[in-house]
């Protein structure tokens, strides 16, 4: 099986889309490592990137994936395909997949498209999404709710049978990379802190979190809101910087994936708010990578009730919040060690499937199932 992977990343940065892509590749690399040398020869995995990736960057070491830097990724993929005759070409991103097919439409027989988002209210976006769906072997969505929503959309259009949609629509969630070393557990005698990790956007509720820590500190004066982020959305920068300077808020800036894991465990309570005011509610159908990280580490997460979070945590999850005083109330409950342990075990059990070693299995199976179908044609 020969696969070329492409993601239009400008640089390596410890943020969601970058980490998702590299964690997936690393998980596939580990799958190849588990094979004996004879079996491994049946596979060839290449990856084209706009920047030069140095093996080991960010803690990502590869033994069986070959990286190619290119200023013109589309032409490089076409050239590599002529040379290697790939079985699949995996592309993350709507515009890049579309551009590839515009250069060579016959690649639709090989295209695996990772759809990161779509908007049912936008005719242009849906036109491109539907074109890619028609002209690909499989389309991967990052969450069950988004995959199901698109499946219903196609069923209503009547262009595909349920059987065909079941084969062609797959779910490829973000993976959580396992820790390299056992993490030092938080001592019970230490105060619980809130931690927010990830890109800062207006919809992620930093103002609500900052207000919540003021309320919490009236009863627990040593508690902090720790904020880790690779970037701040430009239009929100001034307001975000004001909030990051508020009493009780600790601005930690950008941390590596490994440092972030350590700080999450040391803090004790994950915070992941989402106030989605988009017309299509696409963010609400997503899984925030920070929530998956908290869950996999067994750190209780306070989060808003969205379609995606209901799929992750269950209808009856007791730590859904909306307002600052909700966060304060849940924080006080989690100060009970027995309750904290119950919630820790609950999220850890539900987060297990996103650990890379488990999450890669459905992808591995889907690739081989589709590969076998191709060899029969």
Q: What do the predicted segments below correspond to?
A:
Residues 229, 237-269:
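Nucleotide-activated donor-binding/catalytic signature segment of Leloir-type glycosyltransferases, i.e.
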Residues 14-15, 204, 258-263, 270-293, ...:
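Nucleotide-sugar-dependent
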Residues 16-19, 67, 179, 326, ...:
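A charged, aromatic-enriched C-terminal amphipathic alpha-helix characteristic of glycosyltransferases
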Residues 288, 315-325, 332-338:
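Conserved acidic donor-binding segment of nucleotide-sugar-dependent glycosyltransferases
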Residues 49-51, 224-238:
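Glycosyltransferase donor-sugar binding loop
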Residues 3-7, 140, 180, 184-204, ...:
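Conserved donor-binding/catalytic core segment of Leloir-type glycosyltransferases
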Residues 123, 134-167, 176-178, 311, ...:
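A short, active-site helix/loop in glycosyltransferases that binds the activated sugar's phosphate group
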Residues 91-96, 115:
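Short His-centered aromatic/hydrophobic patch
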């Amino acid at each position: 099986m020969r696969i070329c992977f492409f993601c239009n990343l400008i640089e390596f940065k410890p943020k969601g889309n970058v980490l998702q892509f590299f964690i997936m590749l690393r998980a596939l690399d580990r799958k190849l490592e588990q094979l004996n040398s004879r079996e491994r020869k049946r596979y060839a995995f290449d990856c084209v990137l706009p920047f030069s990736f140095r093996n080991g960057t960010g803690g990502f070491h590869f033994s069986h994936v070959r990286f190619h830097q290119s200023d013109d990724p589309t032409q490089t993929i076409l050239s590599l395909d002529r040379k290697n005759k790939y079985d699949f070409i995996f592309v993350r991103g709507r515009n890049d997949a579309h551009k590839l097919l515009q250069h060579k439409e016959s690649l639709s027989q090989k295209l695996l498209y990772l759809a990161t988002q779509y908007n049912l209210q936008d005719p242009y976006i849906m036109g491109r999404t539907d074109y890619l769906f028609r002209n690909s072997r499989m389309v991967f969505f990052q969450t069950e709710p988004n995959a199901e929503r698109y499946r219903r959309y196609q069923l209503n259009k009547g262009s595909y049978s349920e059987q065909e949609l079941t084969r062609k629509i797959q779910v490829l969630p973000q993976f959580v990379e396992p820790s390299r070393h056992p993490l030092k557990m938080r001592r019970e005698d230490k105060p619980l802190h809130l931690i927010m990790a990830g890109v800062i956007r207006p919809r992620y509720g930093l103002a609500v979190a900052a207000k919540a820590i003021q309320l919490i500190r009236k009863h627990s004066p040593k508690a902090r809101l720790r904020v880790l982020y690779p970037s701040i959305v430009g239009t929100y920068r001034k307001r975000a910087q004001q909030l990051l300077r508020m009493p009780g808020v600790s601005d930690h800036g950008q941390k590596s994936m490994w440092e972030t894991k350590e700080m999450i465990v040391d803090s004790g309570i994950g915070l992941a708010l989402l106030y989605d005011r988009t017309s299509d509610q696409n963010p609400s159908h997503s899984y925030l990578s920070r929530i998956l990280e908290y869950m996999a580490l067994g750190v209780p997460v306070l989060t808003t009730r969205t379609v995606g979070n209901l799929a992750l945590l269950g209808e009856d999850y007791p730590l859904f919040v909306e307002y600052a005083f909700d966060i304060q109330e849940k924080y006080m409950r989690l100060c009970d060690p027995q309750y904290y342990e119950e919630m820790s075990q609950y999220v850890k059990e539900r987060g297990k499937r996103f650990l890379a070693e488990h999450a890669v299995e459905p992808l591995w199976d889907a690739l081989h199932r589709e590969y076998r179908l191709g060899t029969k044609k």
